[in-house]
Curated annotation (Swiss-Prot):
Domain Globin: 3-151
Tissues in which the UniProt entry reports expression: Accumulates in developing root nodules and present in roots, especially in the upper part. Detected in leaves at low levels.
Binding site for O2: H64
Name used for this protein in its record: Leghemoglobin-1
Subunit record text: Monomer.
GO molecular-function terms, A-Z: heme binding; metal ion binding; oxygen binding; oxygen carrier activity
A GO biological-process term: nodulation
Major localization class: cytoplasm
Post-translational modification: Nitrated in effective nodules and particularly in hypoxic conditions; this mechanism may play a protective role in the symbiosis by buffering toxic peroxynitrite NO(2)(-). Nitration level decrease during nodule senescence.
Function: Leghemoglobin that reversibly binds oxygen O(2) through a pentacoordinated heme iron. In root nodules, facilitates the diffusion of oxygen to the bacteroids while preventing the bacterial nitrogenase from being inactivated by buffering dioxygen, nitric oxide and carbon monoxide, and promoting the formation of reactive oxygen species (ROS, e.g. H(2)O(2)). This role is essential for symbiotic nitrogen fixation (SNF).
Amino acid sequence: MGVLTDVQVALVKSSFEEFNANIPKNTHRFFTLVLEIAPGAKDLFSFLKGSSEVPQNNPDLQAHAGKVFKLTYEAAIQLQVNGAVASDATLKSLGSVHVSKGVVDAHFPVVKEAILKTIKEVVGDKWSEELNTAWTIAYDELAIIIKKEMKDAA
């Protein structure tokens, strides 16, 4: 179980705010990275099916990527406050949806890599090993809960 320090949570918060400052650009970049890392993942997303490239200014894409980053940010807060990420109705639902869409454990490292690369690009020279560690711990702890909910939903 990962616990985040006040400094790490502050780093996640400030970088999350920077990410949110340009949702169209940053969500597009996130999905571009996902498909560069795992081209086969394209068919998991309705808003990417039948498209030769990641669409610009797609509200569904922006909402999906925004939710991934928001849930990871919220996981960081929970780790600071409670020392753990707690499951809730949203994560239970996500587990079920992920199962129905064909998401498997191997997809989680792809998303993590794309998150980290996106945040690194967003913050530029403010990127640090501590920021990397904070986002990694938050995402890993969130992924553990989502995978558990996927197993329960299967």
